[in-house]
UniProtKB/Swiss-Prot annotation:
Disulfide bonds: 104-182
Family as reported in the entry's similarity comment: Belongs to the G-protein coupled receptor 1 family.
Lineage: Eukaryota, Metazoa, Chordata, Craniata, Vertebrata
Protein's name according to its UniProt entry: Prostaglandin D2 receptor
Glycosylation sites: 2, 89
């Protein structure tokens, strides 16, 4: 057998490995996503009944719900297999020996599926935010609730077809050290195009999605900054323009403090998302194009995969918990109240000077 990985055929968990990190990631992801769903349900954002007490959910929150459910399903389907392997001290291939390599292939398929699906949904949220802030006319005409609901099933169908390519012969799933996880094979001794090509294609697609998400978030951040700057210099004109443009569909009636909320939210999201995605992309390219065909970096691959899994943990805390009224009230008291007082003082001094003139 043409083995490129040290634990490719292992039947036990490598010595020195601990389930602590996997358990912590699973617990944090499960708690965060469940709390996010509870907050969504309590806020009534899941109700589609029109009316003053039950307003229809916005496209943004429909996308948040889809992302939260996707992350929760990924944690519940993938992490128990890792913890079971540690508990039994058996690799994924040995947990169900009668199934052969099917459990390992299923695990790798789920890993690639949920990693790609979450990234696509994050891009959809970034595009929605950028359009709503920078192109309100186009947003109000073309971005509808019905189309927002279709994002999750369309993403799932695409990821299902793309990540199933190794089952059709293009690409290969393999077991990585310490024997508790499987993923796309990124190194091959004979440099088979069907094996290396799929890993490069997957990482290239992830890189393009990350780049597009960062660009959209930077565009949204610039629009927020521009809105805040225009409102400071021309407050009456900005309010009149927003009312005429109809851009208050979602963000048009933003208070300056809410604009600051969105700015900080997008900045934090962009930094964390980029930091968590780049390690796996780098490892895929490194494994495909390095001169030596040995997989001596199994520990680095595992760390890169853990970084990628952190995205599904951070998502609910960033998109939902950060936006709750309690957290925002605390944020305003700590960070924005001095800013408000400073702006009010400067405005009062300017008014006094103008009155004396």
């Amino acid at each position: 057998m043409n083995e490129s990985y040290r634990c490719q055929t292992s039947t036990w968990v490598e010595r020195g490995s601990s389930a602590t990190m996997g358990a912590v990631l699973f617990g944090a992801g499960l708690l965060g996503n469940l709390l996010a769903l509870v907050l969504l349900a309590r806020s009534g954002l899941g109700s589609c009944r029109p009316g003053p007490l039950h307003p229809p959910p916005s496209v943004f929150y429909v996308l948040v719900c889809g992302l939260t459910v996707t992350d929760l399903l990924g944690k519940c389907l993938i992490s128990p297999m890792v913890l079971a392997a540690y508990a039994q001290n058996q690799s994924l291939k040995e947990l169900l020996p009668a199934s052969g390599n099917q459990l390992c292939e299923t695990f790798a398929f789920l890993m690639s599926f949920f990693g790609l699906a979450s990234t696509l949904q994050l891009l959809a949220m970034a595009v929605e935010c950028w359009l709503s802030l920078g192109h309100p006319f186009f947003y109000q005409r073309h971005v509808t609730l019905r189309r927002g609901v279709l994002v999750a099933p369309v993403v799932a169908a695409f990821c299902l077809a793309f990540c199933a390519l190794p089952f059709a012969g293009f690409g290969k799933f393999v077991q990585y050290c310490p024997g508790t996880w499987c993923f796309i094979q990124m190194i091959h001794k004979e440099r088979s195009f069907s094996v290396i090509g799929f890993s490069v294609l997957y990482s290239s697609l992830m890189a393009l999605l990350v780049l597009a998400t960062v660009v959209c978030n930077l565009g949204a951040m610039y629009n927020l900054y521009d809105m805040h700057r225009r409102q400071r210099h021309y407050p009456h004109r900005c309010s009149r323009d927003r009312a005429q443009s109809g851009s208050d569909y979602r963000h048009g009636s933003l208070h300056p403090l809410e604009e600051l909320d969105h700015f900080v939210l997008l900045a934090l999201m962009t930094v964390l998302f980029t930091m968590c995605s780049l390690p796996l992309i780098y490892r895929a390219y490194y494994g495909a194009f390095k001169l030596e065909n040995k997989a001596e970096g199994d520990s680095e691959d595992l760390q890169a995969l853990r970084f990628l899994s952190v995205i599904s943990i951070v998502d609910p805390w960033i998109f939902i918990i950060f936006r709750t009224s309690v957290f925002r009230m605390l944020f305003h008291k700590v960070f924005t109240r001095p800013l408000i007082y400073r702006n009010w003082s400067s405005h009062s001094q300017q008014s006094n000077v103008e009155s004396t003139l």
